[in-house]
Amino acid sequence: MALLIITALVFSSLWSSVSPDAQGDALFALRSSLRASPEQLSDWNQNQVDPCTWSQVICDDKKHVTSVTLSYMNFSSGTLSSGIGILTTLKTLTLKGNGIMGGIPESIGNLSSLTSLDLEDNHLTDRIPSTLGNLKNLQFLTLSRNNLNGSIPDSLTGLSKLINILLDSNNLSGEIPQSLFKIPKYNFTANNLSCGGTFPQPCVTESSPSGDSSSRKTGIIAGVVSGIAVILLGFFFFFFCKDKHKGYKRDVFVDVAGEVDRRIAFGQLRRFAWRELQLATDEFSEKNVLGQGGFGKVYKGLLSDGTKVAVKRLTDFERPGGDEAFQREVEMISVAVHRNLLRLIGFCTTQTERLLVYPFMQNLSVAYCLREIKPGDPVLDWFRRKQIALGAARGLEYLHEHCNPKIIHRDVKAANVLLDEDFEAVVGDFGLAKLVDVRRTNVTTQVRGTMGHIAPECISTGKSSEKTDVFGYGIMLLELVTGQRAIDFSRLEEEDDVLLLDHVKKLEREKRLEDIVDKKLDEDYIKEEVEMMIQVALLCTQAAPEERPAMSEVVRMLEGEGLAERWEEWQNLEVTRQEEFQRLQRRFDWGEDSINNQDAIELSGGR
């Protein structure tokens, strides 16, 4: 009997969650069905058991896949794999803008944890599967701009948590279930649909943001009795319903003749009210300031539901295109989803303000943990510093090589690498340069960044590229090793090297490793690993941008692949440079001596 109970428990645990193998197989099947090229999703390896390290994939702490975001990847007219139904822990599935053909598989109804489904801007055909009605946790459903046909399934009326349904620009026909008009945000335009009910009518501007079906029916009945009564009752119900729903305005899309509504859907991005963030931050009190950078101040906030957030109040935000341009760029940032990137959860815009809302990071930033911890707090140990270096590198690699268009950070430093409750590195402040650079081209001509972290070419030309991020990352590695600031004038008391980079280079040449490493580590580190991190940092901070490695190569070197060869090349080049510098120095000294020895009359020339 005991054996039977144990067996039952084992089987129940197996069925309660999906194994990493099965998750990986399902995702790889999706990659194949989408017809991804060898260059696309190249790290989705069928032989790799754990898909949680794959790009565009996010997992929870139990290694369950919770998010897959593949937006505008330009796949080659693939289809949706029915095997995706295995991913029962999936909460977010975004596949918009990929030219996907065929129908939506029935198995998608097995994704019982799904809260957001975005298949916008593809070539999907056939009917909307009725199995979508099984997704009881679904809040956001976006199927806009496809070729879907047939009627809207009645099963969607059972989705009680749905707050956003966008079905516009398809070939749908028939009646729209009346209960869907109670959803806060909907768009059924550019279809062959009618509003349904006892009195069919097209979905036009008569659809009211604040009325309901019963009030409309009452108005019609009253109209039979008397035309005057219709007007009176109409006014009565209008003001009654307006007052009743004053606290919650529904966002409704309707057809307007000769005009297209340009408002943008943001999936899970939340649009906050200014007053809500003002209250959350205690009127943007200085005591709640977490930090200040080139893009504005960051405030700690507490929402009314108890959620802790970080609110970034942008400066210099005005740019051509106004609110819509800002929103489009905010959406671009929100699409960059990776475990080592700070997730944007919402935004706020007013005539004079632009604010971004992020989750609050429990352990603040790398800079804080290195230099600002309180007495008695644990020191950031060497193992965590290694993990932070690798995590930040992976986040930047994703921005440079997996985002379309790619995102250049422009201010990589220890203060912009945040740490969650598990001390996992989360790169913040990415994508903000485009939001705040006033009337600039795609190549930023205004120097953005922090002294000591800015690459030489950025100072001389004002232009940024992926390689300026690599330089900033290299300086951050030196901060992790030394615990020191990138620029520190107190060093002038003992030496001429104000910049951390020059200071470390000098000590490295003199083989004084013990003087480089952070004294707080108390010699509790592995010497070879410290040397490796310093080598990667110096390769990243070479003066010529073309000689710096790409972030993908940095990741490989930190994982122990290819560093020895690259370091040997750098050392040989450095020897040549030193010899050339000494030769020029001797020539300069000789010339200076010659001038000093000349007669003053010769120097002044003829009179």
Curated annotation (Swiss-Prot):
Give the Cytoplasmic membrane side ranges. 241-607
- Identify residues that carry Phosphothreonine: 281, 307, 444-445, 450, 461, 541
**Segments crossing the lipid bilayer:** 220-240
EC number(s) reported in the record: 2.7.11.1
> In residue terms, where are the LRR repeats?
87-111, 112-135, 137-159, 160-183
Claim: Transmembrane is one of the keywords in the record: yes
> Which positions are annotated as binding ATP?
290-298, 312
Q: Where does the UniProt entry place glycosylation sites? A: 74, 110, 149, 171, 187, 192
- Location within or outside the cell: Cell membrane
Please name the PANTHER family in this protein's record: LEUCINE-RICH REPEAT-CONTAINING PROTEIN DDB_G0281931-RELATED
Q: What is this protein called?
A: Probable LRR receptor-like serine/threonine-protein kinase At5g65240
Name its species: Arabidopsis thaliana
The organism's taxonomy opens as:
Eukaryota, Viridiplantae, Streptophyta, Embryophyta, Tracheophyta
